[in-house]
């Protein structure tokens, strides 16, 4: 590693430890020439994930964009922001582990809905209404009835 002070490429590692939840390694180094100490981080290089939008356009996956959408859907539901951050991290990890580097926005939306359904029914409905482009009250009623059937009798209030 090149010394930022002397530009020498010879250094020794003084200390190494996991950082960023185990996704990187933090190393404290010392230049063998000038004894300047500096820190480096080593991370696995990830190939960007391309999202295929509904209209066919492609864009790079943006965790901040997804997190923003989740925060909007989960406003005033009592869900902790750290849970949403974890959801996005886990989703991104699943996408990185796939063999293909392209994923449809529809697939991302469905993966998010599976997780949201377990966290908050209100957040699920709010996210689904945007993601599935609900056009009116019938779309909400249909989704609620489907949830009610799958959850069993007496789970949700009667709809209709």
UniProtKB/Swiss-Prot annotation:
A Pfam family reported for this protein in Swiss-Prot or TrEMBL: Zn_ribbon_NrdR
Domain of life: Bacteria
Keyword DNA-binding part of the UniProt annotation: yes
GO molecular function terms attached to this record: ATP binding; DNA binding; zinc ion binding
GO BP field: negative regulation of DNA-templated transcription
Keyword tags: ATP-binding, DNA-binding, Nucleotide-binding, Repressor, Transcription, Transcription regulation
Domain ATP-cone: 49-139
Keyword Repressor: yes
Entry similarity comment: Belongs to the NrdR family.
Role played: Negatively regulates transcription of bacterial ribonucleotide reductase nrd genes and operons by binding to NrdR-boxes.
HAMAP family: NrdR
Protein name per the record: Transcriptional repressor NrdR
Annotated organism of origin: Parasynechococcus marenigrum (strain WH8102)
